[in-house]
Each structure stands twice: as C-alpha cells, then as structure tokens.
Swiss-Prot record:
It is found in: Cytoplasm. Xanthine binds at L20, N27, K156. InterPro entries: PRibTrfase_dom, PRTase-like, Pur/Pyrimidine_PRTase, Xanthine_PRibTrfase. Keywords: Cytoplasm, Glycosyltransferase, Purine salvage, Transferase. It comes from Pseudomonas fluorescens (strain SBW25). It comes from the Bacteria. This is Xanthine phosphoribosyltransferase. Its EC number is 2.4.2.22.
Amino acid sequence: MEALHKKIREEGIVLSDQVLKVDAFLNHQIDPALMKLIGDEFAALFKDSGITKIVTIEASGIAPAIMTGLNLGVPVIFARKQQSLTLTENLLSATVYSFTKKTESTVAISPRHLTSSDRVLVIDDFLANGKASQALISIIKQAGATVAGLGIVIEKSFQGGRAELDAQGYRVESLARVKSLAGGVVTFIE
C-alpha cells in the first residue's frame, strides 16, 4: 500500500535492526485519513470472506480495526490487556508476549461477543514473531469461531511470525512488508 509505505518512509523511525517506531501516525498519534485508507484496503481484500466480526488487541490495533469494521459493516472486538470490573464472566483468554515492551500479559474477550457462528478477521498493527496473532487465534478457537484471515498493517518479514502463520494455513494480508531495517533504512518487500 503506497500511502502507508510513504508514511513509514517519512515519519517512521528505525530504532534498531529489529524495531520500527511509528508513533507519529499509528500507535500513539493516529492519522485518521491514513486509517481510513487502511480500512478501505482491508475491506477490499476481505470483502468476499464472510466476515462477521473483527478482533484486535488494545490499543494500537483498534484504529485500523474500527475503520475496517466500518467498511465491512461488522462489529469490532478488542481483547483487553487489563481485566476490568465489568469483564468478569468466564473469559476467553490467552497469554501474549510483547516484543517491543518485553512483557507478557493476558488478553481476554467476553464469550458474549464471540460465538461459534462467527467468521473472524484479525487486525493488528504489527506482525513480528506472531505472538499477538497466535493469542488472538487461540481466543477465537476457544469460542469455536472460524479465523477467516489476518490483516496486518506492518509486517516485519525478517522475523518469523508470517512463516508460522503461513505454515498453519492462515490467510495473511499485510499492507506493508518490511524486508529489513538494517543501517537505519526501511526496505520493503515490493
């Protein structure tokens, strides 16, 4: 997606050979016009997949997930990282390790919102080692729902997440596939 590539080149900051900072437009400050384009693109890619729900993890996946849900006309569910007083019933949950935060947390969704009749699209901001995606897939499977595909805003292709998801037979659509961050330069797989 050229608009996303341009934004990454202009506003993304390479912190290391492993870390790309995109807080100027995606995971701290959000560019609504770019999120609309991202939602349009994911909706076009998955329009014939019978999606009934979108699932993401709070917080950075919420903006692209909402725009995709708006386009597809389906609800968006975000897995919560912190349990609240209102989220108390037998939760669907999984443990996820954050590559950038170097922490492990439990994410959860209420079973009231995800059922065995759902065809679910996972939307996330990044795909690196695939831990967040695998956690969401686990939650979807606990509900007996079907994973219809995964929409990733930025994929770090040099890490193993994509290969693992491909090996499991999941459809993965990434809008920006980063080949390398070596030397402080973002190189894309075109």
